Amino acid sequence: MKKLLIVSFLFFSIVSQSQTYIKANAITTLLTVPNVGIETSIGKKSTFQFDITASFWQSINGKPAQFYIFIPEYRYHFKEKFNGFYVGAHLGGTIYNFQKWNYFNTDNYEKGIGYMAGATIGYQKKIKNRFLLDFFIGGGNHQGFYKGYLISTNERVDGAEHYNKSGEWLPYRGGIMISYKLN
């Protein structure tokens, strides 16, 4: 508990003393999969962003499609922070209850957790004093640890003793973040 308080204090101290933007992804939000984040200055050309993407829904076929993605990311801006091109590197985590694309015509789905390591490229354009647009795309490698179930009975169907494992190279983030400067 003490460590959490110290980390929270340090984080909010940095945020309160630097340029900080809160963000929402216009594209994913229109698709009812909100992606929100916060980006703050940590150096002359460096920023740190933390964002969360969440799907709370089932698919249009009524199959499991819930997932949560948590991504902390370091960003290097080539021109100046919050203006122009940047590259980012991130490590993130996932929680999912999902039917993968190759199981669409079956009764199978997976529940699991995972981690990802990847990169982002983007361009930020200031549009008003406190607003900017952040155009970005990113992806990387996702390693998943899951258990397979039947949708109809919720019975476990895989043969793994503990968890199945899988890894994929995926584009898993992108869009247009509408950003508002807090200070």
Language-model features: where?
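Short aromatic-enriched loop/helix-cap "lid" or pocket-rim segments at secondary-structure transitions
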Residues: 36, 100-101, 146-149
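Outer-membrane beta-barrel "beta-signal"
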Residues: 77, 168-183
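Short alpha-helical hairpin
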Residues: 42-44, 151, 155
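Extracytoplasmic loops and strand-loop junctions of Gram-negative outer membrane beta-barrel proteins
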Residues: 19-21, 56, 101-106, 156-163
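Bacterial Sec-dependent N-terminal signal peptides
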Residues: 1-21, 178, 182
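Short, solvent-exposed beta-strand-terminating loops
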Residues: 137-150
